[in-house]
Amino acid sequence: MSQSEVLQGLDVLVVEDESMICLLLEDMLKDLGCKVVGMAGNFKHAVELAERERIDVAILDVNLGGQLVFPVADILSGRGIPFVFATGAGAGSLPAQWQGHCSVQKPVTVDMLANGLGRAIREQRGS
């Protein structure tokens, strides 16, 4: 199955506090055939969406206006929902618990996003 087939029709949660980046991610996800089902620009909204929305996969900005997103990652992980961290600081900046987890370096390109989301989904499925 190709990367585009894997992503086609998926419901995606975007957690990002910068509105321009949010819009860019939304456009990229639409180009990949995904549907954005939620966009959270702050920690509280991210937690609410992570707990209640039907989500196939998520992209999480690590730093939400000074608040770290890792409790949201815990919620998604507990629900069995794959996700990708987006960080300007690099994967090495992730805490030990999340070292080696799927991440993409900002600024994100559509290819980076597709590869990261595809990897997160494959790892969650164990394939």
Feature annotation, model-predicted:
Residues M1-D11, P95, T109-S127:
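Non-catalytic signal-transmission and effector/linker regions of two-component phosphorelay proteins
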Residues K106:
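A Lys-centered signature of the CheY-like receiver
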Residues L68-P71:
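Acidic catalytic/metal-coordinating carboxylates
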